[in-house]
């Protein structure tokens, strides 16, 4: 059996999958906040409980909201302070008596979608999350590509280019500071939060993403104008990503992925921002929703070989 963990700041979820990645069991508990040892104990207990339930020693994959150095096993997960800068791979492997693998949660999202039966034919799968933040994960032939320092796929920290700034109006363009310390990162524009901030700063009034989208479908002139600008901003930025990575398929997740107009408008807007010989990848909505994190974590042990 394959065990997948989605570890967040408030909840830890374990899900158990068979070799076809069909879920057989899941459990959620609160994330310990008092000590690293307590955090390790909770994960250990969940694994032992699953081992007993299924009478086996399952593989353990973990998705975290941060980075894990694959050489040292040390995690950088600042919103889970008890486990931040700790050697989680070494410590969990010793406690559980087996190899433990861990990846950024966006990579797990992408991996889950790459292992869907409808996507397994594609050698290069790019997952993009347009949620609270904007980020992604890159999968080559069923395996996460995270790079030498675990930063591959951190597309939210690419910055607006010439064409994006021109679209937003040069000296009128709102320049947002990112939590990473830089300015004009895609995370602050293409996320749900960025969608709302841009509308506020360009249209002069504050609305939620849901309200903006409702106004768009009601054919409100300012909302229609803004959405078309946002689609163009996405096309410019995602076009750059396609030029660099040339994926066969892009899977969208996060709150804005529920905006159906994206799937109609974005493929039409992309070609003018690509090389003439480039193919526009298939753009699809994520299938597994909230289960994608645990499913992708479990898939860290799968191989197409």
Swiss-Prot record:
Q: Where does ATP bind?
A: 4-11, 133-140
Amino-acid positions noted as binding Zn(2+) in the UniProt annotation, renumbered to this chain: 157, 178, 180, 185
Q: Tell me a GO biological process for this protein.
A: peptidoglycan turnover
Q: Which UniProt keywords apply?
A: ATP-binding, Carbohydrate metabolism, Kinase, Metal-binding, Nucleotide-binding, Transferase, Zinc
Q: Which reaction does it catalyse?
A: N-acetyl-D-glucosamine + ATP = N-acetyl-D-glucosamine 6-phosphate + ADP + H(+)
Q: Which pathway does the record list?
A: Cell wall biogenesis; peptidoglycan recycling
UniProt-recorded Gene Ontology molecular function terms: ATP binding; N-acetylglucosamine kinase activity; zinc ion binding
Key word Zinc present: yes
Among SUPFAM superfamilies, the record links this protein to: Actin-like ATPase domain
Q: Sorted alphabetically, which PANTHER family does this protein's record hold? A: N-ACETYL-D-GLUCOSAMINE KINASE (PTHR18964:SF162), ROK (REPRESSOR, ORF, KINASE) FAMILY (PTHR18964)
Q: What's the family? A: Belongs to the ROK (NagC/XylR) family. NagK subfamily.
HAMAP family per UniProt: GlcNAc_kinase
Q: What does this protein do?
A: Catalyzes the phosphorylation of N-acetyl-D-glucosamine (GlcNAc) derived from cell-wall degradation, yielding GlcNAc-6-P.
- Protein's name according to its UniProt entry: N-acetyl-D-glucosamine kinase
């Amino acid at each position: 059996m394959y065990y997948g963990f989605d570890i967040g700041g408030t909840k830890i979820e374990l899900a158990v999958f068979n070799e076809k990645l069909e879920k057989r069991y899941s459990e959620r508990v609160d994330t310990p906040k008092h000590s690293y040892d307590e955090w390790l104990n909770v994960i250990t207990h969940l694994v032992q409980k699953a081992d007993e339930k299924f009478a086996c020693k399952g593989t353990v994959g973990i998705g975290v909201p941060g980075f894990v150095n694959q050489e040292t096993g040390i995690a950088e997960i600042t919103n889970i302070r008890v486990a931040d800068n700790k050697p989680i791979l070494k410590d969990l492997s010793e406690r559980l008596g087996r190899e433990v693998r861990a990846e950024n949660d966006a990579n797990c999202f992408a991996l889950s979608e790459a292992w869907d039966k409808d996507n397994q034919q594609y050698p290069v799968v790019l997952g993009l999350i347009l949620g609270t933040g904007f980020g992604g994960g890159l999968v080559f032939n069923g395996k996460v590509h995270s790079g030498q320092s675990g930063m591959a796929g951190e597309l939210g920290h690419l910055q607006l280019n010439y064409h994006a700034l021109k679209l937003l109006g040069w000296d009128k363009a709102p320049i947002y500071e990112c939590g990473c310390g830089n300015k004009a990162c895609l995370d602050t524009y293409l996320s749900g939060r960025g969608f709302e901030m841009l509308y506020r700063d360009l249209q002069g009034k504050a609305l939620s993403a849901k309200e903006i989208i409702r106004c768009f479908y009601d054919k409100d002139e300012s909302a229609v104008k803004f959405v078309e600008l946002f689609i163009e901003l996405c096309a410019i930025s995602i076009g750059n990503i396609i030029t660099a990575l040339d994926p066969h398929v892009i899977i969208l997740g996060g709150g804005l992925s529920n905006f159906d107009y994206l799937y109609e408008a974005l493929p039409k807007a992309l070609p003018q921002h690509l090389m003439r010989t480039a193919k526009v990848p298939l753009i699809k909505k994520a299938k597994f929703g909230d289960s994608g994190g645990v499913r992708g974590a479990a898939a860290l042990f799968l191989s197409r070989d």
